[in-house]
Amino acid sequence: MASLKDMRVRIASTKATQKITKAMQMVAASKLRRAQMAAEAARPYAEKMDAVISNIAGAAAGSPGAPVLLAGTGKDQVHLLLVCTGERGLSGAFNSSIVRLARERAYALMNQGKTVKFFCVGRKGYEQLRRTFDKQIIENIELRSVRQLGFVNAEDIAQKVIARFNNGEFDVCTLFYSRFKSVISQIPTAQQLIPLVVEAPAAGSVATSYEYEPEEDEILSTLLPRNLAVQIFRALLENNASFYGAQMSAMDNATRNAGDMIRKQTLIYNRTRQAMITKELIEIISGAEAI
């Protein structure tokens, strides 16, 4: 049985840990609001741009001059999974849930005889995926040194993806990230980027015909690479908000658990101390009676 000194050390250690988790919770809460506002502000632009491009692409999809980012390679053999995760842990299941979704997709594709490659953005995703897919990871980008996420970061990733696509390294690219819903809810999401998926018009909607100048193909050649960067930037912002939400929730749970441990350890300490005092009193009384 542990001595009273060991128990005091354990209680003090748990209290110190509780202070750390409480501080991390407060830091995450302060950063969450800004990250949430950035993610929510990016959604309308990204969704509207996707809708505009889908409208233009609907008319150009069948033309022989359609951009390759829209038309694709005509094959469905090599898949690139662009997996965006965080740079740090202590955030509950935030990173592992994204990796799990990507891993499930990879196994499903491999069972169909497809070739799977990984493009990792974020240290935690890379560390988890390399355990089983080390030889299939073709690139890894870490954003640890980036203090404030900017569109330039997404553009850099998009340019590297497009360069590999133009080199014929893959046929289909799918983006994996975590969509922020609330502090306690982040949704792992998969979104196909290449070739662009043109959404069918909603049932009952009236199709509107537009005339474009210059031609649709020329407009798409400019807009498609930018849309790729916009969708990646949106994913990075969603991930950022999801990370702080998950970390805030995880640190809150850790703080509560530390409080429960302190109460239990203190109760055991007091009972042990009381038992030792009672034992000593009995020994003193027994000795006095013997005299």
Curated annotation (Swiss-Prot):
Subcellular location: Cell inner membrane
Topology within the bilayer: Peripheral membrane protein
Major subcellular site: membrane
GO biological process: proton motive force-driven plasma membrane ATP synthesis
Annotated InterPro entries: ATP_synth_F1_ATPase_gsu, ATP_synth_F1_gsu, ATP_synth_F1_gsu_CS
Domain of life: Bacteria
One Gene Ontology CC term in the entry: plasma membrane
Key words of the record: ATP synthesis, Cell inner membrane, Cell membrane, CF(1), Hydrogen ion transport, Ion transport, Membrane, Transport
Entry's Gene Ontology molecular function annotations: ATP binding; proton-transporting ATP synthase activity, rotational mechanism
Keyword Calcium listed: no
CDD domains: F1-ATPase_gamma (cd12151)
The UniProt record lists the keyword Transport: yes
Function: Produces ATP from ADP in the presence of a proton gradient across the membrane. The gamma chain is believed to be important in regulating ATPase activity and the flow of protons through the CF(0) complex.
Family: Belongs to the ATPase gamma chain family.
Subunit structure: F-type ATPases have 2 components, CF(1) - the catalytic core - and CF(0) - the membrane proton channel. CF(1) has five subunits: alpha(3), beta(3), gamma(1), delta(1), epsilon(1). CF(0) has three main subunits: a, b and c.
Entry protein name: ATP synthase gamma chain
